[in-house]
Protein backbone atom coordinates (compact mmCIF):
# COMPACT_ATOMS: atom_id res chain seq x y z
CA UNK A 1 0.00 0.00 0.00
CA UNK A 2 2.88 2.36 0.78
CA UNK A 3 4.41 1.85 -2.66
CA UNK A 4 1.08 2.49 -4.34
CA UNK A 5 0.71 5.65 -2.25
CA UNK A 6 3.91 6.94 -3.86
CA UNK A 7 2.34 6.69 -7.32
CA UNK A 8 -1.39 7.34 -6.82
CA UNK A 9 -2.48 7.69 -3.19
CA UNK A 10 -6.13 8.38 -4.01
CA UNK A 11 -6.42 5.19 -6.10
CA UNK A 12 -4.73 3.22 -3.32
CA UNK A 13 -7.18 4.68 -0.81
CA UNK A 14 -10.16 3.86 -3.02
CA UNK A 15 -8.94 0.27 -3.33
CA UNK A 16 -8.35 -0.08 0.41
CA UNK A 17 -11.80 1.31 1.13
CA UNK A 18 -13.70 -0.82 -1.38
CA UNK A 19 -11.74 -4.05 -1.78
CA UNK A 20 -10.24 -4.92 1.60
CA UNK A 21 -12.04 -6.48 4.57
CA UNK A 22 -14.17 -3.73 6.07
CA UNK A 23 -12.98 -4.16 9.62
CA UNK A 24 -9.24 -4.52 10.02
CA UNK A 25 -7.64 -4.80 6.58
CA UNK A 26 -9.32 -1.69 5.22
CA UNK A 27 -8.42 0.43 8.25
CA UNK A 28 -4.83 -0.78 8.14
CA UNK A 29 -4.57 -0.25 4.38
CA UNK A 30 -5.99 3.27 4.56
CA UNK A 31 -3.72 4.13 7.47
CA UNK A 32 -0.64 2.88 5.59
CA UNK A 33 -1.55 4.77 2.41
CA UNK A 34 -2.08 7.96 4.38
CA UNK A 35 1.22 7.43 6.21
CA UNK A 36 3.06 7.04 2.91
CA UNK A 37 1.26 10.01 1.39
CA UNK A 38 2.00 12.17 4.46
CA UNK A 39 5.71 11.47 3.99
CA UNK A 40 5.58 12.90 0.48
CA UNK A 41 2.76 15.45 0.63
CA UNK A 42 1.54 16.15 4.18
CA UNK A 43 -0.97 18.82 3.17
CA UNK A 44 -2.51 16.57 0.50
CA UNK A 45 -2.85 13.69 2.97
CA UNK A 46 -4.35 15.95 5.64
CA UNK A 47 -6.82 17.47 3.17
CA UNK A 48 -7.93 14.04 1.97
CA UNK A 49 -8.27 12.73 5.53
CA UNK A 50 -10.41 15.69 6.54
CA UNK A 51 -12.58 15.55 3.40
CA UNK A 52 -13.18 11.79 3.61
CA UNK A 53 -13.85 11.32 7.30
CA UNK A 54 -17.01 9.25 7.70
CA UNK A 55 -16.75 8.80 11.45
CA UNK A 56 -19.88 8.88 13.58
CA UNK A 57 -18.18 11.78 15.36
CA UNK A 58 -16.80 14.00 12.56
CA UNK A 59 -14.55 15.87 14.98
CA UNK A 60 -12.88 12.55 15.96
CA UNK A 61 -11.16 11.76 12.65
CA UNK A 62 -9.50 8.31 12.72
CA UNK A 63 -7.96 8.94 9.30
CA UNK A 64 -5.59 11.50 10.80
CA UNK A 65 -3.86 8.70 12.70
CA UNK A 66 -2.33 7.51 9.41
CA UNK A 67 -1.13 11.05 8.74
CA UNK A 68 0.43 11.27 12.22
CA UNK A 69 2.18 7.91 11.69
CA UNK A 70 3.60 8.99 8.35
CA UNK A 71 4.75 12.39 9.54
CA UNK A 72 6.39 10.88 12.62
CA UNK A 73 8.74 8.85 10.43
CA UNK A 74 10.53 11.95 9.12
CA UNK A 75 9.16 14.94 11.04
CA UNK A 76 7.99 14.04 14.52
CA UNK A 77 7.36 17.69 15.41
CA UNK A 78 4.90 18.01 12.51
CA UNK A 79 3.19 14.82 13.70
CA UNK A 80 3.05 16.23 17.22
CA UNK A 81 1.45 19.43 15.89
CA UNK A 82 -1.35 17.41 14.24
CA UNK A 83 -1.77 15.40 17.46
CA UNK A 84 -2.11 18.56 19.55
CA UNK A 85 -4.81 19.90 17.22
CA UNK A 86 -6.92 16.75 17.52
CA UNK A 87 -9.98 17.08 19.74
CA UNK A 88 -10.49 14.59 22.58
CA UNK A 89 -11.47 11.19 21.24
CA UNK A 90 -10.23 7.89 19.86
CA UNK A 91 -7.96 9.42 17.20
CA UNK A 92 -6.18 11.53 19.83
CA UNK A 93 -5.72 8.50 22.12
CA UNK A 94 -4.30 6.35 19.33
CA UNK A 95 -2.02 9.13 18.08
CA UNK A 96 -0.74 9.82 21.59
CA UNK A 97 0.11 6.17 22.18
CA UNK A 98 1.93 6.03 18.86
CA UNK A 99 3.85 9.26 19.56
CA UNK A 100 4.80 8.12 23.07
CA UNK A 101 6.45 5.09 21.48
CA UNK A 102 8.22 7.18 18.83
CA UNK A 103 9.50 9.76 21.32
CA UNK A 104 10.76 7.05 23.68
CA UNK A 105 12.60 5.47 20.73
CA UNK A 106 14.34 8.81 20.08
CA UNK A 107 15.64 8.98 23.63
CA UNK A 108 14.73 9.64 27.21
CA UNK A 109 15.43 13.38 27.19
CA UNK A 110 13.30 14.05 24.11
CA UNK A 111 10.53 11.78 25.44
CA UNK A 112 10.43 13.63 28.77
CA UNK A 113 10.38 17.01 27.01
CA UNK A 114 7.42 15.82 24.95
CA UNK A 115 5.62 14.38 27.98
CA UNK A 116 6.11 17.56 29.98
CA UNK A 117 4.29 19.48 27.24
CA UNK A 118 1.19 17.28 27.28
CA UNK A 119 -1.80 19.43 28.22
CA UNK A 120 -3.17 18.99 31.70
CA UNK A 121 -6.78 19.56 30.62
CA UNK A 122 -7.30 15.81 30.03
CA UNK A 123 -5.93 14.11 33.16
CA UNK A 124 -6.99 10.64 32.01
CA UNK A 125 -5.11 10.91 28.72
CA UNK A 126 -2.11 12.48 30.43
CA UNK A 127 -1.99 9.76 33.10
CA UNK A 128 -2.25 6.96 30.56
CA UNK A 129 0.39 8.37 28.24
CA UNK A 130 2.82 9.29 31.02
CA UNK A 131 2.32 5.81 32.46
CA UNK A 132 3.13 4.15 29.14
CA UNK A 133 6.11 6.43 28.65
CA UNK A 134 7.32 5.88 32.22
CA UNK A 135 7.21 2.11 31.80
CA UNK A 136 9.20 2.24 28.57
CA UNK A 137 11.69 4.81 29.85
CA UNK A 138 12.25 2.92 33.12
CA UNK A 139 13.37 -0.08 31.07
CA UNK A 140 15.83 2.18 29.21
CA UNK A 141 17.21 4.31 32.05
CA UNK A 142 15.80 3.76 35.51
CA UNK A 143 17.78 6.60 37.16
CA UNK A 144 16.74 9.23 34.60
CA UNK A 145 13.13 8.10 34.92
CA UNK A 146 13.36 8.41 38.72
CA UNK A 147 14.65 11.99 38.36
CA UNK A 148 11.78 12.74 35.99
CA UNK A 149 9.23 11.38 38.49
CA UNK A 150 10.69 13.62 41.20
CA UNK A 151 10.09 16.65 38.97
CA UNK A 152 6.42 15.84 38.32
CA UNK A 153 3.56 17.37 40.29
CA UNK A 154 1.75 15.05 42.66
CA UNK A 155 -1.16 13.99 40.51
CA UNK A 156 -2.57 10.82 39.00
CA UNK A 157 -0.09 10.93 36.11
CA UNK A 158 2.94 11.13 38.40
CA UNK A 159 1.61 8.27 40.53
CA UNK A 160 1.17 6.14 37.40
CA UNK A 161 4.75 6.87 36.31
CA UNK A 162 6.01 6.13 39.84
CA UNK A 163 4.13 2.83 39.91
CA UNK A 164 5.66 1.77 36.59
CA UNK A 165 9.11 2.88 37.75
CA UNK A 166 8.81 0.86 40.97
CA UNK A 167 7.60 -2.18 39.05
CA UNK A 168 10.69 -1.99 36.85
CA UNK A 169 12.96 -1.38 39.82
CA UNK A 170 11.63 -4.41 41.69
CA UNK A 171 11.94 -6.54 38.57
CA UNK A 172 15.58 -5.49 38.19
CA UNK A 173 16.29 -6.23 41.86
CA UNK A 174 14.86 -9.73 41.57
CA UNK A 175 16.98 -10.60 38.55
Regions found by a protein language model. Name each.
Residues 1-175:
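Non-catalytic tandem-repeat scaffold regions and their flanking low-complexity/translocation tails
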Amino acid sequence: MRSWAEIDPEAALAYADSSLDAKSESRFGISEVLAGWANRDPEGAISWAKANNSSDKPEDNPLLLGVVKGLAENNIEAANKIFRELPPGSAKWQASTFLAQKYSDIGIRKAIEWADQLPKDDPRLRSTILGQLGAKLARQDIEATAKWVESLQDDKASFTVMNNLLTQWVTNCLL
